[in-house]
Amino acid sequence: MTETMTMPADSVERALIPILSADEVHTVAEHALDEARQRIAEIESVAIGDVTSENVLDAWDRAAIVIEDAFGPISILNSVHPEKSVRDAGDDALIAESSFMTDLFQSERFYERVRAVVPASSAQKQLRKDLIEAFEDSGVALPPEKRERFKTISDRLTELGQEFAKNVRENATRLTFTPAECEGLPQPWLDRVPRDEAGNVVVGFDYPDCVPFMMNARDEAARKRYYVGNTNRGTERNIAILDEIVALRKEIADLYDVPSFAHYVTKRRMVENPETVRRFLDEVRSRVTEAEIRDLGQLSEVKSAMSGIPLDQANISRWDVNFYRERLREQRFAIDQEALRQYFPTKASVDWMLDVSERLYGVRFERRSTSSVGCQLSVVSCQQPATDNSLNRQPTTDNRQPIPVWHDSVLYYDVLDSSDGTHIGGIYLDLYPRDGKYKHAAAWPVRGVSTKSGRQPISVLVTNLNGEGLTHDELETLLHEFGHVLHGVLSKTEYLQHSGTSVERDFVEAPSQMYEEWASRMESLSLMREHCGECPLIEQELVDRLVSATKFGAGIDYGRQLLYAAFDMELSSEHPRGCVEVWREMEGATPMGHVEGTAFPGTFEHIASGYAAGYYGYMWAKVIALDMVSAFGADLMNGETGRRFRELILSRGSEEPARELVEGFLGRAVSSEAFFARIQGE
């Protein structure tokens, strides 16, 4: 159930996200599943001899649209709606959807009819292949007992994944620090955070609290206490959940008679098998270990100089990294992340991001006025900017009806093709932290495109930005997630199943990682001035220092990514062990060692959900991303290249394998040269 709205004096009928109550979530979910069952039954009733692409593939596309029209909106409301009752209803609905989808892809009658299709186009051929693989990965070809066990496991994994994410999202733990423990923190941060009756600072774990604290608090004991609390926010329950998830995944591998869950998963990805992943991680390890040790040595020098500790005793702990890296950046590159917020005011940065995207991809974003409905906004705090320094991107003030949103801080934009004004789709931006909201930054492809059905896309950007301005790191994150949004809303695929980010898991991060580079180039950053007349001028000398400061610490950063990826693969291996035991052992083998009393696996939402045996994909995709940047040459704002990227990569979704799309864009095979140079800080 996706709402549509035609505005007065506006000929566009746009799809919108319905703002549902808890009762409506249940009703919408039930009705959608009932209608989908009827549509699937019609497909199953087609005689094998009468099968065509129209009565099977096209009919499936229409059934998939019914499902997504309901569960796309439910999925985003489940993660961001201010009312807990709606989020809880979303948990139940998404579990029901997952169970339905497993049943659907275990239907032998449906499977037989898909196999009987004779495709007449490349898109039909790819959809037929994708559907057959989805059936086979859901157990349709397994013996009945194994098929039923797969169904039970799949349902349980969905329940566990939902509970894991909920435990992190709704953990309201706060830590209290004395004013002395907060020495070094910027005054705007101190003015913003709440205090208890004794005047102590009360800090949660949202990004706007966490990042400044770990970068600036001079008290090492305070940083350690915050680091431990943040690392343990997943609770002991999540450790038990993850161990059960790992065991169930291994059982799936056993049902398919393959050595490991990694074998079961990677066969559908660019790497094709876990051996390729391990070789890739080994190559990263051979390059990154020395770089990480070198970076830590430089931080030790800073710690020794600042604290008076002898260099051989100035060991860097995990709660030291961000603090001393910032001091090194200040000393060596004259870069102060907190001071950078004046260059990147939050609202102006969002406007700049939209402007850059317009120029690159030949689109236009038109902001519409919005109206929050269906939630008690008076009891929901949200860290919005106190002032608006942006020069444009104000909402329209004509007689068009406001767009309904779930919170009064949420923005909505129509997306138009700049060449002819054609309406392409819509995007929602939910930018600021609040209680109960998803804690990280992510994009939701709420509504995928289907040119076959005349369907337009909707994407949602969810972040937890500091309302008073962004650091350079936060600007990169904003661009990264908006890269996912663009991948969704600029998709132009024939079938819904191929739309947007529905690509191989180890490719999905590449377009968004590529977009991060626009945060570090003069030709793009110079445009910030057009969106904030009061901001300091960004000059080439500053950009050069930003780039140098960003490159420092690459060994530490990629060393951590390597640890995450290797940990994920170990949990998906032939003989998985308890997650805490594995983590203690693997983190303990790194240069900084394991921090006793911490349980990071309980917060690792990626591997509790769709990224299992897939976290390596962040680095694998980075190889592709940095190579694709090379196609822009010396000018990242080259609109001709940007529109080629839109046409050859973003618009195609998964209508072709990712490798073929990338090689078509580059005109050659992918090279890892730029990636390994980045690891070395070059």
Give residue ranges: language-model regions.
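Short, basic, low-complexity termini and linkers enriched in Ser/Thr/Gly/Pro
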Residues: 302-306, 370-388, 392-403
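Short pre-active-site segment immediately N-terminal to the catalytic Zn-binding motif
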Residues: 465-479
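N-terminal helix-rich structural modules
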Residues: 2-185
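Active-site-proximal, well-structured secondary-structure segments within enzyme catalytic domains
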Residues: 123, 127-129, 156-159, 166, ...
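C-terminal, non-catalytic "cap/extension" segments appended to globular domains
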Residues: 2-27, 31, 200, 348, ...
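Short His/Asp/Glu-rich catalytic/ion-coordination signatures at enzyme active sites or charged loops
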Residues: 10-24, 73-93, 116-152, 202-239, ...
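Alpha-helix capping and helix-loop boundary segments enriched in small/acidic/polar residues
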Residues: 236, 272, 344, 469-473, ...
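Short, hydrophobic/amphipathic alpha-helical patches that form generic packing surfaces
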Residues: 65-76, 133, 228, 321-327, ...
